[in-house]
C-alpha cells in the first residue's frame, strides 16, 4: 500500500500495450477502415493515442507507466518475408502443397490460402505478440498490463465497408481453454504457469473494476459472445474469459479491453476526430471524444480498485 498522503497508484508499474501496429501496417493487419476518400481510422493508431493519454493520467496518479510500443511500428524484428517457410508448412498441413505466392486479385478462401497471407498473419499475430511478451516479461516487468484495443463488427469488403448498428463493450481475462488448444504442449505450459503465478487472483477483480469504469464512462452495453471460445467471468456482464496469445504469454495480470464498434456510424465519426477534451459538434449534436471516454473509464476503474485494495 502507498504511504498516507501519496497518490493511489504510487509504486505501481503499469504497462500499456496499444493493440495492433497501425501506421503503414494497418491495411495488412485488416485494421484500416474508410467510408470515403480522404478519411480513415486505424485501430493501431487509435490505440496508441489512447495509450499516450493514459500514460499521462496514470503517471499523475503516481504510477510508473511504460508503453510496450511507442510508435506505429512492429516490436518484432521479423518481417513476413522471414516467415515463408513456416507459412508453407501451415498450408501443407491444410493439404495445400503448391500455394500461390501472392494474394493480389484474390479474396476469401483463395486469399487465405496464399503464402503471402499466411506469412503476414504469422508476422502480426504471432511473431509480434511474442516480441511484445519478451519486452513485457524481460524488460518492463510490470505489475499489470492493459491491452488497449477497439472492437468491430464484420464490415464486408475493405473497399466497400458497411456500417453496423451494434456498439458494445467487453473486457477479457485469460481462460476458457479448449480441448484442441490444450493438445499443444506450449499452451498447456503457459496455462499452468499462469495458474501457479496466481495472476487470476488480481486479474479477475481488476477486470471487473475496469469494466465498471468503462461502462460508466462510455455508456456501452455488454457484448454477448455466442461462440464457445469465451465464457463470462468475474461475475460481471462485461467480462469474459478467453484464451488469447497476449493474455496467456504476459507473466502478470492482464486486462484486455475491447470497447466500441469502429464501424458503428456514430462511433466512426467520433473516432475520425481523434482525441479532444470537452465536446464538439458531430452529427448535429455536441459529443465527447470516444478516446477520452475510453481513458476516463480506465482511470476510473483502476482508481476504484486500488483505493479499495491499497489502503495505507
List the predicted regions and their residue ranges.
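Loop/turn elements at helix/coil->beta-strand transitions in domains of secreted/extracellular proteins
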Residues: 11-13, 60-65, 139-145, 251-255
